[in-house]
């Protein structure tokens, strides 16, 4: 193992020259090189122990270089024999200089590439290929090698002996080496190797040395502080990425989130990131961002910070996890790290990207006119399924909303969107304004905010609350008028007064009714079928606008309940048509179910209205050559001419 890691020192260039000599017979050169510092060093080398400090001693270099390419292979070979280091150990002891090289090299020599190849890169590739096979977890991260590259010789010799004893003591488990190396690993990627062996505690001595080595290396000066942190780092094994990613904000974050000791170290800039995340196991990335601003001022108590962030954030469950002692969160963190921002399954993950989308996403969903029902159902499912179950703590949700919601009042806008998006939720916006308002404080915020699935969860509760109103609203709300409902809903949400909300809700639905695009479409087809003759006559008369518009009228009168809906609906329909129902140029408006241009219709040759208008326009066949008509027709089609459309000509 050591060979592999120390190999990077080749980058130093001192050894770069040697490889050419050594390449032909790595074994010979290794024997020749008498640079082994001491018996202890030789022994350790035989064992395959690599000391971060000993990166550049020529003695070590020999095996290293040969092994550079197969670096991991020897590792796997050596590692398996941790319990029985004797092969290497005995060999090393018996013939210290030659044996270590022999034992380590024989396999590697086969592998070794001509000296010319840049070893570090090869090693990286090899490690990538072998990684995860024999190496102890600590070896797995590729990052460690770079630091050794920066090692200085002074570290190597003095440190090798000093570190040698600890490895021997702990030698029996292969981890000791890993652990010893772990300081380096951890420094580089505190958690990349979720260290299966937390021997770091036992290895405290080596870790400190490793820390010093790291400083000497300058490999990861920022992480140098992690020497002490390494132990917490073990618990925070999964947080390596976070360390790197959050490093800038980490010092600030750690003090609030990490335990005091962690906080101090965090200021060090060492494992602080790890500390932060371990301490607040369930912190969501959003919360981290939120806390980012906090750092300038204060290290708030861990519990307070996470809880405040969560409350602002809408995470009820997180608070518990975060406030817990770092150790507990650390365990969670170990599970968590893969998605650093998610929380452990138990906790409701209030990602702020979940809560924030509540506003925009709401709008988007509503505009998309995804079924009112579909939207809420989808949201609830998404949260409950993969992320953990928000549903279980609906009560908590309600209670939490009280404190949490007030701040995010800015999310209120989505509220009016709510009525629109769903039959399920629309009940909410209207009735919640109505009934939840009586339970004033918490419920009022929900209407305003209703950001997370939290509301959707209570949603089930809400429907019972106002069954009558809810149903009415849901019926009306399929697509609340985009514009009006927002204004109305805004009134609803902000104004707790129950009356305004219901009244507003009721008026809005009629307005919105013309809008319902999805449902009416199907209805339209049927209705058209039923009264097709009559309608066809109407159209022939040119009573109404183009097909879509008339259809809107027809639909609207039902919801508006007005025969007079015809004209009024016409306008609404016009808006609808303009917005949603662009008829494609040749789409058949009221065609037979077959959608064919055929005589099934009372008015036969039912081409798209603009086409039929052109065709039916009185043409002076003598005066206007056919190509003129063609041009006009094609122009209208290309432009999808609304204005040329029957709106103008259609009276014929």
From Swiss-Prot:
GO terms for molecular function: ubiquitin protein ligase binding. Residues 123-486 are annotated as: Interaction with GGNBP1. One of its GO terms (biological process) is gamete generation. It holds the Pfam family GGN. The keyword Phosphoprotein applies. Interacts with FANCL, GGNBP1 and ZNF403/GGNBP2. Residues 491-652 are annotated as: Interactions with ZNF403/GGNBP2 and OAZ3. The modification Phosphoserine is found at residue 389. It is linked to Spermatogenic failure 69: An autosomal recessive male infertility disorder characterized by low sperm concentrations, globozoospermia, and absence of sperm acrosome. It comes from the Eukaryota. This is Gametogenetin. Residues 523-532 have a biased composition (Basic residues). Keywords: Developmental protein, Differentiation, Phosphoprotein, Spermatogenesis. Residues 18-30, 124-133, 538-552 have a biased composition (Basic and acidic residues). Residues 213-230, 251-267, 299-312, 407-422 have a biased composition (Low complexity). The lineage of its organism: Eukaryota, Metazoa, Chordata, Craniata, Vertebrata. May be involved in spermatogenesis. Residues 138-149, 163-178, 428-466, 495-513 have a biased composition (Pro residues). Residues 1-39, 52-237, 251-273, 291-473, 488-576 are annotated as: Disordered. Residues 201-212 have a biased composition (Polar residues). InterPro entries: GGN.
